[in-house]
Amino acid sequence: TVQFNLIEGGFKGPVMPINPNQQSVSGVLAYRDIASLPVTPELAILTTSLDEAPALIQELGARGTRAVLLLSRDVLQDHRGARVALLSPDLSQKHADDGESLKQKILEAAKPYLLRIMGPDHLGYAVPSTHLNASLSCTRPLAGHIALLCQSAAVMRSVIDWATRRDIGFSHVISVGMRWDVDFGDLIDYLLRDSNTRAILMYMENTHNRRKFVSAARAAGRVKPVIVLKPRDFRAGPIEDAVYDAVFQRAGILRVNNIEQLFSTAETLATAKPVYSNRLTLLSNSYSLALLTSDTLLRHGGRLAEISEATRAQLARDCRPDYPIENPVDLGDMAGPEEYGKALDLLLQEPGTDGVFVIHAPASVDRSMDSARVVLERAKNQRLIMSCWIGEAAVEPARDLFRAAHIPTYEAPGEAVEAFMRLAQYRRNQELLIETPPSIPEGFTPDIETARRIIQIALTAGRHRLNAYEASQVLSAYEVRTVPLQFASTPEAASEIALELREPVALKILSPDIANKSEVGGVAFGLNNPLEVLVAATGMLERVSELVPNAVIDGFAVQSMQSRHNAYELMIGVRTGRRFGPVIFFGQGGTEAEVIDDVAYAL
């Protein structure tokens, strides 16, 4: 299949199949072995079993080859979900170990020659502009300016077929496979420097080298759009997916939810003028359609742009006398090219809008092509213009007119709104790319030794979580203001602290075995005197002994009550993700935090 694709694709370079048992392969002269090749191949494609690969890679590297595609498919998943080489019929831990050992042998064979390896378990890749199709795909991708990186062979085939039917072309189509060597970070870094690539699309399920990936994506995001379609891994839990969202935002990557959005976003970013906020002006010959579109815009977090009083008055005089003009701007079903032209001339000068979305519905007098030409003339303006000519055969020529001029056009208003909001999000991601943390204030001298000592004591005790008292001390060491907290080892000691404070207090039990104190009745607020504190602390010990009998009790935390009207209870902390390590989280705190789940993550 690979050789057929290479020849049928029109590749002009030499194709040298190696087969010791045949004189030719698909009509092309075959060679017995690597040593028999008349010239050194720049790219070698191995379709042999993986256990033969190390020796072949070493021979190719010694000869001067610098890239190898491992198209071997003798890989499966072991019981842990990790892909391994299948070296015998039954799949067991031994074969998983053999697979990892084989991977290391392949990488060690390539290392002395700086030879890079793609795969295994992938479809190969194609560069349509050079007629190179070194893939197992049965559909030849068209040439274009969009690069596609795909972790799934099935998704890659589907995307190529989907794009071909819509006349969408690619600069590169790359199946990444198991990424034993070349991974997403390497490929993004390469495509960043490719002048024929205007946008990078990715289907990814996970990434191995997080630092390389984020670094490459941030560099590419400054130059060209990087758009990712990543399914949510429900086995990993919602936190892991939220961390990926934070990574994508920090790297300037735009995340979409399906294949249609993947391409529509790429097309929009490649053809649309930039926006700087989420303010959109709607212009239509149908108030009902404009109203429905405004609902969609607001639901997606967009805003209707403010139109100045002077512009609204001029619109009323020029387009619809004696009719109140607001945003959405309704021109009426009799509007034609003259009304569209006057309205656009005024609206595109408004400083409070980021773009104008023109929605045209079929009317009793069909002037859709004339109106489309007027819109097309105004599209030379520096502001964004988007169009939606609703209908099928009657309006298709108008859509073709917009497409030929690279004006964003859509079949349904909702698609356009989603595209506009992704433009706004892309702009926001670009701003995040250049954000840097503020400098440390002058005169700030944290007590690092105290913080380290507290943490070391906890680690020595085999704990991975600080109690409230220790956390308060660490925060104080870094000059973070907190409500003063005092430690009490017994209920009687807690009562004595309350006597000294002479004001209502809050009481919390301290235990490394109790993460959520409220679930075991380990928190009491508004205790007015020492007796109430004594009774509450004693009751906490009794409840904990029943609910968590093996829990180690360190003592109690006593704090003055802080009551503020309409105050928010928040939480902030650090969690460790499976792939991206420590991440900061911030959100709603309190007893209902897990139920409400209003949390944001950031690197």
Label every PLM stretch briefly:
Residues 1-603:
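Catalytic-core regions of core metabolic enzymes
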